């Protein structure tokens, strides 16, 4: 029996709608929006291979981008869907580029290092031609190398969308989400309120569904989880829909379009807890 995430269905109604590292993976004639997924990899068992580009594993220094943890595959399924799990993606026509920045090695999950995170951002821009970089993770320190990589991507016209973190109201800043030029994403619940676990420190620009979410595991099964990681994937999908219809939009234009159309909650306008409000796109904004 197919399950379709309630919040993804809501958003869909609102919308209306291979190579080695160092070479271009996108055919010149292909106009599909490319989202780089800096995460744990993406399972080719769960996600349609036609939606996947060949990426790189910065942990093992190899081309093995299969997911051994689930996190990256879950985010990917929100964006492009997973047939075996019965999940309909928000932007099923985009291409996903798996860049592995954390992995399971010898049974242990490796942490994300600033060096690896920065390099993956540079490569997403320079080698793989990504339009959007989704970072559903982060580090708790403002590191010069990461900040410079983010600034470089922005100057090159690549939008970075990142989760703000799950440590609650008093949570410390997560980077890159805390950088001003990055679109930071927090989570809201079914009642349209900021999730208790979502950081409320001013780093969130938008809120998106992050609770009671059905997504795909690396084996292609459906499972439930929560977190700002998955809210970020929702926003990346929405941004990809905008770029599909308006491919020349600059990162700040995409951000402004999303902010302008957000459903404001809390204090009028931007506020520390919810940013500009809840992600909302309507058909006219996609024309």
Could you tell me what each predicted segment is?
Residues 15-16:
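C-terminal motif of bacterial Sec signal peptides marking the signal peptidase cleavage site
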Residues 25-35, 40-54, 62-113, 179-181, ...:
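Subtilisin-like serine protease catalytic core
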Residues 2-10:
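Sec-dependent signal peptide recognition
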Residues 230-247:
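Short, small-residue alpha-helix embedded
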């Amino acid at each position: 029996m197919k399950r379709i995430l309630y919040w993804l269905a809501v958003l869909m109604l609102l919308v209306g709608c291979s190579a080695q590292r160092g070479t271009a993976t996108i055919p010149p004639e292909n106009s599909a929006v490319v989202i780089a997924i800096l995460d744990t990899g993406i399972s080719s068992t769960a996600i349609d291979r036609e939606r996947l580009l060949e990426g790189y594993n910065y942990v093992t220094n190899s081309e093995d981008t299969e997911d051994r943890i689930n996190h990256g595959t879950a985010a990917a399924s929100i964006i492009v869907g997973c047939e075996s799990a019965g999940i309909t993606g928000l932007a099923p026509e985009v291409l996903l580029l798996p860049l592995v920045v954390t992995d399971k090695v010898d049974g242990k999950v490796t942490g994300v290092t600033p060096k690896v995170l920065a390099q993956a951002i540079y490569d997403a821009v320079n080698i793989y031609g990504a339009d959007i970089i989704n970072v559903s993770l982060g580090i708790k320190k403002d590191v010069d190398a990461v900040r410079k990589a983010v600034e470089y991507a922005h100057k090159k016209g690549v939008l970075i969308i990142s989760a703000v973190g799950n440590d609650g109201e008093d949570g410390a800043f997560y980077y890159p989400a805390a950088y001003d030029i990055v679109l930071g994403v927090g989570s809201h619940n079914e009642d349209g309120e900021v999730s208790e676990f979502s950081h409320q420190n001013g780093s969130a620009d938008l809120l998106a569904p992050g609770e009671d979410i059905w997504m795909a595991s690396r084996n292609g099964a459906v499972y439930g989880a929560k977190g700002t990681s998955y809210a970020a994937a929702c926003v990346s999908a929405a941004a990809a829909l905008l770029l599909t219809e308006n491919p020349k939009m600059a990162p700040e234009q995409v951000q402004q379009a999303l902010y302008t159309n957000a459903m404001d909650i809390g204090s009028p306008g931007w506020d520390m807890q919810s940013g500009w409000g809840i992600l909302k796109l309507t058909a006219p904004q996609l024309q």
